[in-house]
């Protein structure tokens, strides 16, 4: 079962927590869920060049707090914070409530599964050979501390007449082990021959304590140790 299920959903409540963190009664739940989906779709499309790894949405009393984890936060913030203010106003209109916007820098994009998948998809769109793109991503992830990585590419690879799936793995990726800290990300490459799908699994080690926030806390600590200078974070109210 661990081979087929989404590794993040499989570990929710064990060593992963939800990206939408709020509570609502039955009357409001559907509306807020659709709001979250619209916010994420808008941000992923609008900030495509900023390398969005994750969007966390929290809803304290009659407010909305959106935290964007990005590999290139400067593109979101803009000159003197002009772009982030426009973005905050747009999100306030979408949620119809006061919205706070936080930007958190991802210091090691090479070991973030979503960013790795996006990078490979962009290379496929630029007609880079899929094997070269996969191998380069694997080498970068292992060099920066990943204990294992697996990448699959599916579609008309290299312009082939028949679609197929190719995969590459290095190190351990124990999908059945619930205490394993496994990051998972997907992306689509819109090539001249059709859409190619990219999936990435990255094994970052084992988390022995039973704590839903453990994976997120561990990633933050790793970023702070690996990066130079202070953590780059911008809050806009």
Curated annotation (Swiss-Prot):
Entries under InterPro entries matching the protein: KH_dom, KH_dom-like_a/b, KH_dom_type_2, KH_sf_prok-type, Ribosomal_S3_C_sf, Ribosomal_uS3_bac-typ, Ribosomal_uS3_C, Ribosomal_uS3_CS
A single Gene Ontology CC term: cytosolic small ribosomal subunit
Protein keywords: Ribonucleoprotein, Ribosomal protein, RNA-binding, rRNA-binding
Domain of life: Bacteria
Region of interest (Disordered), residue spans: 213-237
Record's keyword annotation contains Repeat: no
GO aspect biological process, one term: translation
Keyword match Ribonucleoprotein: yes
UniProt-listed SMART domains: KH
UniProt cross-references to CDD domains, sorted A to Z: KH-II_30S_S3
Gene3D superfamilies (UniProt xref): 3.30.300.20, Ribosomal protein S3, C-terminal domain
Any GO MF annotation of the entry: structural constituent of ribosome
Sequence ranges assigned to domain KH type-2 in this UniProt record: 39-107
Quaternary context: Part of the 30S ribosomal subunit. Forms a tight complex with proteins S10 and S14.
UniProt record similarity statement: Belongs to the universal ribosomal protein uS3 family.
Its biological purpose: Binds the lower part of the 30S subunit head. Binds mRNA in the 70S ribosome, positioning it for translation.
Protein known as: Small ribosomal subunit protein uS3
Organism encoding this protein: Rhizobium meliloti (strain 1021) (Ensifer meliloti)
Lineage: Bacteria, Pseudomonadati, Pseudomonadota, Alphaproteobacteria, Hyphomicrobiales
Gene this protein is translated from: rpsC
